[in-house]
Every structure is written in C-alpha cells, then in structure tokens.
C-alpha cells in the first residue's frame, strides 16, 4: 500500500473537486491507488447526485455560439441549470456550460434529448452532467436548448448583473427568431 500523503490528497482533490475527507477515505479504500480512488469518488458522487435529482434546478447560465455551414449559419444555445446562483456563476460551471455547448455543436444536436445522448469525450453528455452534479454538489441539468439556422444568425446574450453569466439569450436568423432564458422568466 502506498503512503497517503498530504500532497497525494491535494492532487486528487484538485483533480476531482471532492472534499478532503472523501479523498482520504477513497485513497485508503483504494490502498493509495490514485486512479482507483478517483473512480471511487466518481461513483460515490454520481450516487449522491442521483439523490439530488428531485431538487429544483432553476438557476443557471446560457452559452451560445454561431457556426458557419454550407447553407449559411447555425446558432446553438444551451441552458445549464443548478440549484443556486452561487454555483451557476462559478468559473467552472460557466466553463462546463461552454463544454456542453461544444458537444451540441459537434453532434449538430437538434433537441435537448439529442444533446444528452451526444458524445462527451469517452462518455455521453448525460453522464458528464451527472458527474458535474457530483462535482458541484447540487442538482445540475440541461435546461433549454435551441438551434436556429439561416443565411445569417445573430445572438444577443443578456446578463442580470455584471458578475453573473448570461441568463437570457436571443437568437435571430434571417427568417426566424428564438429566445432562451433561465428561470424565473422575464414574464414572471
């Protein structure tokens, strides 16, 4: 069994985002094997995330992107929700939202359901979101998804405040328009 040092605990914490005690328990259970400890943490995190699934996740952020296509342009927008704005505004959450958007673009997804089944590295977006829920310690879900195509597409992203990521995104194509917003809606 390898010695479980503070440096080893720190390394696994940075890689997984898990708490110090959880990392120490996982390393002890894995007899110092870092890869096995990470797998134990991931499995426990996904199990815990499943328990949070019934909670409301209505805070969040929206990422959007316009890409050129053979017939013009296509705009994609993905809303990723968490339980609190505290999590939604963290750089890691915003970065993960951008990653999910990238998976939508790569898969040329047409709906949130298609996005959840899309490849995310060596897994699916659905499993990546479950792993993110374990990392953030909150229920995380893909909220709204929109795709719009036309000769030309423009996107407007609105922030509720300067420190928050976009919470309202409007996309307009030469002959169509759509609007995404995080809850509560501007109409509430």
Predicted feature locations:
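N-terminal assembly/interaction segments in proteins that build large macromolecular machines
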Residues: 2-183, 187
């Amino acid at each position: 069994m390898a010695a479980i040092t503070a440096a080893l605990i720190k390394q696994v914490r940075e890689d997984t985002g898990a708490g110090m005690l959880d990392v120490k328990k996982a390393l002890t259970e894995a007899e110092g094997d870092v890869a096995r400890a990470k797998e134990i943490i991931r499995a426990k995190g996904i199990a815990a995330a499943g328990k949070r699934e019934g909670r409301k996740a209505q805070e969040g952020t929206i990422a959007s992107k316009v890409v050129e296509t053979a017939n013009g342009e296509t705009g994609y927008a993905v809303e990723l929700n968490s339980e609190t704005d505290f999590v939604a505004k963290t750089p890691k959450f915003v970065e993960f939202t951008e990653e999910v958007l990238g998976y939508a673009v790569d898969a040329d997804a047409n709906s949130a359901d298609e996005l959840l089944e899309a490849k995310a590295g060596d897994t699916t977006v659905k499993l990546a979101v479950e792993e993110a829920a374990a990392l953030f310690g909150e229920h995380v879900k893909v909220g709204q998804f929109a795709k719009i195509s036309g000769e030309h597409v423009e996107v407007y992203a609105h922030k509720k405040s300067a420190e928050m990521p976009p919470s309202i995104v409007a996309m307009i194509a030469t002959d169509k328009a759509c609007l995404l917003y995080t809850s509560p809606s501007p109409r509430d």
